[in-house]
C-alpha cells in the first residue's frame, strides 16, 4: 500500500516539506462535466440565462478556482501558477457541459489539485449561471487526465467518456 505523505507518524495531518525536492516543470490536466436537464441545456445552447454567457463566466471561475486552491485545500502548498487554459465542450447527446483545465508551473510539488479545483469551481459557476432557468442539473465526476513532472514523470489516465484525450 502507498504511504500517505500528509500524515506524521502519529497519524496527524501535516503539510509535507517539499524543500528537498527539485524544481521541475509541472503540468496537470483535469476534466469534468455538469449534466443538464432540458431547460438548462436550452439556455446554455441559446447563449445563456438571465445572468449572461455561462461559458465565459465558468472559464473565469475555473481560473479563480485554480488560483485559490491552497485556500480551499488545507494541506495544499501555495504555488506560483504560470498558465491556466480552460476549454469547454457541449455534448448534446448526453446533455453534458464539459470543462477541461490545464495548469502549469515550475515547482517542487504537483499541480493536480489546482487543475481539479479549477474544473470543480468552473462547473459550480456554470450551475450558478443556469440555476435561474432550472435546478435540474447534476454535477458529474471530475478527474485527473494527465500530470507531468516530479518523480513519477508523465502519468496519463484515460477517461472513455471524456471528449479529450490525455
Labelled PLM ranges:
Residues 1-55, 60-166:
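C-terminal binding/interaction regions
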Amino acid at each position: 500500500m502507498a504511504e500517505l505523505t500528509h500524515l506524521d507518524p502519529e497519524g496527524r495531518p501535516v503539510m509535507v516539506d517539499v524543500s528537498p525536492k527539485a524544481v521541475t516543470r509541472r503540468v496537470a490536466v483535469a476534466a469534468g462535466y455538469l449534466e443538464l436537464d432540458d431547460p438548462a441545456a436550452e439556455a446554455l445552447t441559446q447563449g445563456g440565462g438571465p445572468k449572461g454567457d455561462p461559458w465565459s463566466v465558468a472559464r473565469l471561475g475555473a481560473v479563480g478556482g485554480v488560483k485559490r486552491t491552497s485556500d480551499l485545500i488545507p494541506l495544499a502548498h501555495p504555488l506560483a501558477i504560470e498558465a491556466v487554459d480552460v476549454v469547454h465542450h457541449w455534448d448534446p447527446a448526453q446533455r453534458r457541459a464539459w470543462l477541461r483545465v490545464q495548469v502549469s508551473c515550475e515547482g517542487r510539488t504537483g499541480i493536480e489539485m489546482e487543475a481539479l479545483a479549477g474544473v470543480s469551481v468552473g462547473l459550480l459557476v456554470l450551475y450558478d449561471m443556469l440555476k435561474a432557468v432550472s435546478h435540474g442539473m447534476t454535477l458529474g465526476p471530475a478527474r485527473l487526465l494527465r500530470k507531468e513532472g516530479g518523480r513519477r514523470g508523465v502519468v496519463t489516465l484515460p477517461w472513455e467518456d471524456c471528449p479529450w484525450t490525455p
